[in-house]
Amino acid sequence: LMPIARQQLARESDASEIVFIDDALESVAEVNAHRAMNYLAFLNETASEKYVQIAIANSHVREKIAQRLKMDGIQLWSIIADNVVLMDQHELAEGSALSPFVTIGSNVRIGKCFQANLYSYVEHDCVIGDFVTFAPGVKCNGNIHIHDHAYIGAGAMIKQGTPDQPLVIGGGAIVGMGAVVTKSV
């Protein structure tokens, strides 16, 4: 996600430094031409504001890190690729990561730390919970409710629900890659 973060800072004319955080590091190193450090070193960095994009697929680990960041007064950072399409009346909570070629339809509500990988879309009137992960190429059609911590595998297609009976993907559900979901799970 670093290239997307760099694009976003450039688009916003923001000169903030991007650093990579990895608790396995014992000393400052370099990753993809950026300084890399453990979380304690990051906390000790001097900055007027600090934001973190949690680029970890495991939703429960993401949630734990988000809670720790909140306790430490560090804000979640949403990053959005240059070519993402955002339609009317959408709500995107903090900490989301929208990769290239993602589309978010109209009247969509998305919870915090949502990850939408390459070529995924969320169509109209969907509600996506917190810490949901879309692998590449997920097709989430209209009137679908996806609860917290669901994982939707690469190329999965979810059939459109109706306004009075949305299709529901339950909390913590795992939809396998290439799946075609026609009923609530």
Task: Tell what function each PLM region has.
Residues 79-185:
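Structural signal for interior beta-strand "rungs" in well-ordered beta-sheet cores
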